[in-house]
């Protein structure tokens, strides 16, 4: 609304001076998506669609069947193109997979099985040709490993297109959930001088000419670098998020994070996306309840909004996936301490590749076993302080910390979090024990000097969530352009 004062000094509503400009810039689309066409009940009606050819089949009856997809749905829309069209022989009968087209015609009820609508074309305009001889995505099925070589094209396949739509839904659900919970969305730095995890597995950021330095035999002097100190790509936005949680009460970050781990596994990426909420005045119980509500909301949204894609994953990728997600949504999460979990693992008859001992990290095989025994998600708490980062709150026993990991069936850990250490002296002691230079974290320590409060948070790797929801076996297939050791293509 736009208000101004009249000559009588009263407020009057007038048209905003930029309103007409905005309307012209944001004109409604004048074509219809494939998804809308396939689900339309307003028939018959004229429509225009824009998309890419999946297949073409010529009929002896004097027309061609074109399967067109625009990425808005898993299924294609069948276009019936009659021979009477002026470019039928010259263009339509030469269409191959990958060609882009604009089709106008009448959307009608389809007599064919497996589809509710089809488009009877009055015009088929070819926008971009695609060489059928060299186009990689032919009819034959390619392995996911092979498709990674064509990451710039693989979203055009059924599976990867469905993965990206689910990834989008999860991302949207994350934002909506935290907005509903009263959290502020916070942008934390990607370039940082802090190591949140204290593991040192970080990518170095520098503008110095390293080749020139190597040839000069001079020592590496960070004072000559852009930031005049060692800097890295962030492994987490948690520490920065804590600073804003102690001002705004509830915040969350959602952005790219980086780990320089030389791990070539189906569960690890060098670059991935993390969502990290932080809440002041939260203890570990509050944190666990938030994590449970969060996962249930995300999974529920995927089932509600991605029905066709989820049916596809349930049938083609992992049988029973939908029932598994429904079970997670409907059942309360089981709670178990780390110590209880270790005792269960030691008492069971299962043969594990990695031995189980109190004081060591649980492996994925241990986590999967626990969820299978419980028959649903498990939240493990109270881990040994020796295997957890310095910022986690030390428990009264002095041996454990107020940490939590959320484990889900088939995958294991999907969320990791904790109540943060709010006591200045304990935090300083933990940093010293970990060999951390307190002067590098002076701003973080300051939070405990000026109005410290109990607070907690957790982290969820987006790709782990997408992998779990879709059932995809390899994490490299749930991110558009995977970054792994030896691979930074595209």
Swiss-Prot record:
Catalytic reaction list: tRNA(Asn) + L-asparagine + ATP = L-asparaginyl-tRNA(Asn) + AMP + diphosphate + H(+)
Gene Ontology MF annotations: asparagine-tRNA ligase activity; ATP binding; nucleic acid binding
Group of enzyme by EC: ligase
Keyword Coiled coil: no
InterPro entries: Aa-tRNA-synt_II, aa-tRNA-synth_II, aa-tRNA-synth_II/BPL/LPL, Asn-tRNA-ligase, Asp/Asn-tRNA-synth_IIb, NA-bd_OB-fold, NA-bd_OB_tRNA
Chief place of localization: cytoplasm
E.C. code: 6.1.1.22
One GO location term (cellular component): cytoplasm
Disulfide pattern: none
Keyword Nucleotide-binding: yes
Keywords, alphabetical: Aminoacyl-tRNA synthetase, ATP-binding, Cytoplasm, Ligase, Nucleotide-binding, Protein biosynthesis
GO terms, biological process: asparaginyl-tRNA aminoacylation
Gene3D superfamilies: Bira Bifunctional Protein, Domain 2, Nucleic acid-binding proteins
Subcellular location(s) per record: Cytoplasm
PROSITE patterns: AA_TRNA_LIGASE_II (PS50862)
Assembly, per entry: Homodimer.
Family under the similarity heading: Belongs to the class-II aminoacyl-tRNA synthetase family.
Name of the molecule in the record: Asparagine--tRNA ligase
Species whose genome carries this gene: Rhodopirellula baltica (strain DSM 10527 / NCIMB 13988 / SH1)
Lineage, top ranks: Bacteria, Pseudomonadati, Planctomycetota, Planctomycetia, Pirellulales
């Amino acid at each position: 609304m736009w208000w101004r004062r009249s000559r009588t000094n009263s407020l009057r509503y007038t048209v905003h001076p930029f309103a007409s400009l905005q309307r012209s810039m944001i004109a409604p689309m004048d074509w219809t998506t494939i998804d809308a066409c396939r689900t339309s009940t307003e028939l018959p009606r004229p429509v225009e669609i824009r998309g890419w050819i999946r297949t073409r089949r010529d009929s002896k009856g004097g027309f061609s069947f074109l399967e067109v997809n625009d990425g808005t749905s898993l299924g294609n829309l069948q276009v019936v193109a009659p021979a009477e069209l002026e470019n039928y022989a010259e263009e339509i009968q030469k269409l191959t997979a990958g060609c882009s087209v604009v089709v106008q015609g009448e959307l009608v009820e389809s007599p064919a099985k497996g589809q509710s609508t089809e488009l009877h074309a009055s015009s088929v305009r070819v926008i971009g040709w695609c060489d059928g001889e060299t186009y990689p995505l032919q009819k034959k099925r390619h392995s996911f490993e092979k498709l990674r070589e064509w990451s710039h094209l693989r979203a055009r396949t059924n599976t990867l297109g469905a993965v990206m739509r689910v990834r989008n839904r999860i991302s949207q659900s994350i934002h909506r959930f935290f907005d509903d919970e009263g959290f502020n969305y916070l942008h934390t730095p990607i370039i940082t001088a802090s190591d949140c995890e204290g593991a040192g597995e970080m990518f170095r950021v520098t503008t110095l000419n390293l080749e020139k330095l190597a040839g000069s035999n001079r020592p590496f002097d960070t004072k000559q670098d852009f930031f005049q100190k060692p800097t890295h790509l962030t492994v987490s936005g948690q520490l920065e998020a804590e600073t804003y949680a102690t001002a705004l009460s509830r915040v969350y970050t959602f952005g790219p994070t980086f780990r320089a781990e030389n791990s070539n596994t189906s569960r690890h990426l060098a670059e991935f996306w993390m969502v990290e909420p932080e809440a002041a005045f939260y203890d570990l119980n509050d944190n666990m309840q938030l994590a449970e509500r969060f996962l249930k909301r995300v999974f529920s949204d995927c089932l509600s909004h991605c029905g066709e894609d989820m049916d596809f994953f349930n049938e083609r990728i992992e049988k029973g996936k939908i029932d598994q997600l429904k079970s997670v949504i409907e059942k309360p999460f089981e709670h178990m301490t780390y110590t209880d979990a270790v005792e269960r693992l030691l008492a069971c008859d299962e043969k594990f590749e990695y031995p189980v001992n109190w004081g060591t990290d649980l492996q994925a095989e241990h986590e999967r076993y626990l969820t299978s025994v419980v028959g649903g998600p498990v939240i493990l708490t109270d881990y040994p302080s020796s295997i957890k980062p310095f910022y986690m709150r030390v428990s009264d026993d002095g041996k454990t910390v107020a940490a939590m990991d959320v484990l889900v069936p088939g995958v294991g850990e999907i969320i990791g979090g904790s109540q943060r250490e709010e006591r200045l002296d304990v935090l300083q002691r933990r940093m010293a024990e970990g060999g951390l230079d307190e002067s590098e974290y002076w701003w973080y320590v300051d939070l405990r000097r000026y109005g410290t409060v109990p607070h907690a948070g957790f982290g969820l790797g987006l790709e782990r969530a997408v992998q779990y929801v879709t059932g995809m076996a390899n994490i490299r297939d749930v991110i558009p352009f995977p970054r792994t050791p030896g691979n930074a293509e595209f």
